[in-house]
């Protein structure tokens, strides 16, 4: 074994370097983690790596909380198939037709509801772009501010429950998913409020950025408005609040609530006569693809993280940084910057499953609340989704609104990236923003 000639902890640093290089050059993440974990584990502590691999994969397969992932994914896809978000957007558009910037408010409100229904960023940005861009163009809205609003609203799916990322993050950080859901609600509403305040101020200073809607886009009667509003808001809101509320108030586990939500979304699609055999098949295939990707990554990263921890590198790194006697908030700032930079080229999945377990011992040693830290990570990754040059949200939006210049989309996103940073700083300075609701609900 190589451990006879080199400190296993140093071997762990080499493992991280090789892993990052392999991912950045394009090797499949799951297979890279399994292969490197096996090779470096065998070099570091021999045949024990076989038992470690079996144990970690078995733990993932028997983790009941992760069963909520495919159910929440299916719930979101069926809500999309039923066309409920389009109806809700139309209702808000009609209600606020005479208000400056009304379409910005409609996008943000729908994005909050849709985030609570799906938890998938790509789907949120795509649907919001399809729904809103045409009306915004016809009404003469500013492309940059419109693009920023759509992409920022779409990224709320990372944070607002039932966020798929929070469902996965809970078992990894050994935090109850209910705590993470409760902690994410107020920060999510805070960010949406900051977005709305920003668009309001911009439209007040320059009314041409969000003019009132032209007559052809307004309702012919208030009856039409209220029918659209009721049919668009009440069913999805009732479904979301039933699923989320049952989790927060302890009536059901996340998996049970996800199962009820999935069945409810299927019934809604049937009630609205939007469900066909082809759409159901597509929804099931999409659910399978997304869920399989996440589950294999969870298992692979669990094994990789276990090997890395067994090599002793996390403790060596923690002892080294604590020995420097730096201010703990300075170390937190360094961690946030690192996660932000990694969020440019990488999806949230490898960051949450690989990087977070590596730095978790350090965060615990510094005495930070793990629930609060998890919300900081979520908001930080949301910020990275809005940050050029990679900015994955920009490409989702460009794909459905090709007439918008990518430069304008980038410029619009950067405005909201600054708002995200302000929100992140507020949560750091005032931890109660994230921790008050879990404490109130669960007495922590």
Q: Which residues does each PLM region occupy?
A:
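Membrane-interfacial helix-loop connectors
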Residues: 40, 127-139, 169-182, 311, ...
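Long, contiguous bundles of hydrophobic transmembrane helices that form the permeation core
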Residues: 4, 172, 179-290, 395-415, ...
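Transmembrane alpha-helix interface/packing and boundary motifs in multi-pass membrane proteins
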Residues: 19-29, 75-80, 110-122, 150-158, ...
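Hydrophobic transmembrane alpha-helices that form the pore/transport pathway of multi-pass ion
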Residues: 93-168, 348-377
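Generic alpha-helical transmembrane segments of integral inner-membrane proteins
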Residues: 13-24, 35-42, 70, 74-78, ...
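Short amphipathic alpha-helical coupling elements at transmembrane boundaries
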Residues: 55-59, 87-98, 127-138, 147, ...
């Amino acid at each position: 074994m190589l451990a006879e000639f080199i400190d296993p902890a140093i071997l762990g640093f080499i493992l991280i370097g090789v892993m990052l290089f392999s991912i950045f050059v394009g090797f499949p993440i799951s297979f890279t983690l399994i292969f490197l974990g096996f090779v470096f584990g065998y070099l570091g502590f021999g045949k024990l790596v076989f038992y470690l691999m079996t144990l970690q994969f078995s733990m993932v397969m028997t983790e009941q909380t992760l069963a909520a992932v495919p159910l929440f994914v299916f719930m979101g896809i069926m809500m999309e198939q039923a066309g409920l978000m389009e109806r809700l957007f139309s209702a808000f558009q009609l209600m606020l037709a005479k208000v400056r910037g009304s379409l910005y408010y409609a996008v943000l409100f729908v994005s909050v509801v849709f985030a609570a229904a799906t938890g998938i960023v790509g789907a949120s940005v795509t649907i919001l772009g399809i729904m809103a861009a045409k009306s915004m163009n016809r009404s003469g809205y500013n492309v940059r501010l419109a693009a920023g609003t759509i992409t920022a609203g779409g990224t709320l799916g990372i944070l607002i429950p039932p966020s798929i990322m929070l469902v996965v993050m809970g078992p990894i950080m050994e935090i109850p998913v209910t705590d993470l859901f409760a902690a994410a609600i107020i920060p999510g509403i805070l960010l949406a409020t900051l977005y709305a305040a920003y668009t309001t101020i911009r439209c007040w200073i320059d009314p041409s950025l969000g003019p009132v809607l032209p007559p052809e886009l307004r309702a012919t009667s208030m009856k039409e408005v209220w029918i659209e509003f009721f049919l668009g808001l009440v069913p999805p809101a009732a479904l979301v609040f039933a699923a989320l509320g049952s989790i927060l108030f302890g009536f059901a586990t996340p998996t049970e609530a996800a199962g009820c939500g999935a069945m409810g979304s299927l019934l809604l699609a049937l009630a609205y006569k939007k469900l066909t055999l082809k759409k159901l098949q597509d929804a099931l295939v999409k659910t399978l693809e997304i869920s399989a990707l996440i589950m294999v990554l969870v298992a692979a990263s669990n094994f990789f993280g276990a090997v890395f921890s067994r090599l002793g590198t996390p403790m060596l790194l923690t002892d080294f940084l604590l020995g420097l006697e730096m201010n703990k908030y300075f170390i937190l700032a360094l961690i946030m910057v690192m996660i932000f930079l990694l969020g440019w080229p990488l999806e949230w999945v490898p960051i949450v499953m690989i990087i977070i377990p590596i730095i978790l011992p350090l965060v615990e040693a510094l005495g930070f609340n793990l629930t609060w830290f998890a919300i900081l990570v979520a908001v930080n990754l949301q910020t990275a989704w809005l940050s050029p040059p990679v900015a994955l949200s920009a490409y989702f939006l460009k794909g459905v609104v090709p007439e918008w210049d990518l430069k304008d989309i980038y410029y619009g996103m950067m405005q909201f990236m600054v708002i995200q940073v302000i929100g992140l700083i507020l949560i750091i300075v005032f931890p109660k923003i994230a921790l008050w609701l879990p404490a109130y609900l669960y007495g922590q």
